[in-house]
From Swiss-Prot:
Record family assignment: Belongs to the TMEM59 family.
Coiled coil: none
TM spans (from-to): 263-283
UniProt entry tagged with the keyword Membrane: yes
Biological processes per GO annotation: branching involved in ureteric bud morphogenesis
Location (main, coarse): Golgi
Keyword Translocase: no
Residue stretches of biased makeup (Pro residues): 45-54
Topology in the lipid bilayer: Single-pass type I membrane protein
Name of the protein this chain belongs to: Transmembrane protein 59-like
Cell location: Golgi apparatus membrane
């Protein structure tokens, strides 16, 4: 009996063991778990939850600070790549190192942060997998509607390229982090440190492609900060058509009317079908416009005859008479009745 109960207990223990929380922004920023694991392997030690940088400089605390700086380097590289929208790892690595230099003062922390930037550089195979996943359309019932919507979006975006909007997402994760994302080249990150909340803002300058600003300012004690609710804000901006996301005609109409995008697409598609059906029905049901000639009677022929000013036929020449002998002259005086 004990031999049977032991495997059952082990199975229940494996089911009860909590699974590690996954970053909800991994599809947008990329998975940083592998980079953070490399940081922990490179700097062995169990780091506490975001220690204070002003604490005593002991060996375990120093290792924890280095691990935190390395993990922050991983996140900074992902944020820089998301903000700059660039697939060149060298340029993103330079921006990440510049952000690490501005974020930390000590050389060891800057070096650890730079190591996090180096560890987050995607491998070629990972990049190919991400491209395949991005290009692969969703499968299932919505695949046909997805193809139609993408076709209409491409057609409408070429005509409505000047309209653009930037989305801002503010979400709170399970590990007490409030992260703010938006499509404009500004990304904000709220990192929890001890009992205080710190705001990290990364700003990308258009005039200087290699200039990346990083600002860190404390928000206040955590007790005074309410639990942030997910909210979405929109703001209008004029940007180039290459940097636009969700700026097509259907998205603009969906934001202005409040209706889902698929409802607008169905209405547009049905209206086109109705117009085609009406045009075809008009061609079929319209009576013929051909003139039918009916034979006329004799009275109708007489009424249609009109005397013309010119002869219908050329004049005939006068008949020619043959020459005859002159008439006889009769003398009436000599005649007797």
């Amino acid at each position: 009996m004990a031999a049977v109960a032991l495997p059952l207990l082990l199975l229940l223990a494996s089911l009860v063991t909590p699974t590690p929380a996954r970053d909800p922004f991994a599809p947008q920023l990329g998975d940083t778990q592998r980079c953070q694991q490399r940081c922990r392997q490179h700097h062995p030690g169990s780091p506490p939850a975001q220690p204070e940088p002003e604490g005593p400089s002991e060996s375990p605390n120093n290792k924890a600070i280095l691990i935190s700086a390395c993990e922050r380097g991983c996140r900074l590289f992902s944020i820089c790549r998301f903000v700059a929208k660039s697939s060149r790892p060298n340029a993103t690595e330079t921006e990440c190192e510049a952000a690490c230099t501005e974020a930390y003062v000590k050389a060891a922390e800057q070096r650890a942060c730079s190591e996090g930037c180096w560890g987050q550089i995607p491998e070629p195979e990972t990049q190919l997998e991400q491209k395949d996943l991005a290009l692969d359309p969703p499968r299932g019932r919505l695949s046909l509607r997805y193809l139609f919507s993408m076709l209409c979006s491409d057609l409408m975006s070429s005509a409505q390229g000047f309209l653009s909007s930037s989305w801002t997402y503010s979400l709170q994760t399970d590990n007490r982090k409030v992260v703010v994302f938006q499509t404009q080249p500004v990304a904000e990150n709220f990192a929890f440190q001890g009992s205080h909340l710190q705001r990290v803002e990364v700003t990308w300058r258009r005039s200087h492609p290699k200039a990346l600003e990083l600002h860190m300012d404390p928000v206040g004690p955590l007790d005074k900060v309410r639990k942030a609710k997910p909210r979405v804000k929109t703001s209008k901006a004029k940007v180039e058509s290459e940097d636009q996301q969700e700026s097509d005609f259907l998205s603009c109409m969906s934001r202005r009317s409040g209706l889902p995008r698929w409802v607008l697409f169905c209405c547009l598609f049905l209206s086109i079908l109705i117009m085609l059906w009406l045009s075809c029905c008009t061609l079929v049901t319209t009576p013929g416009q051909h003139l039918k000639f009916q034979p006329l009677t004799a009275e109708q022929h007489k009424g249609l005859l009109v005397e013309s000013d010119w002869p219908l036929y050329p004049p005939l020449p006068p008949p020619a008479y043959e020459d005859s002998t002159p008439p006889y002259k009769l003398k009436l005086d000599l005649t007797t009745l």
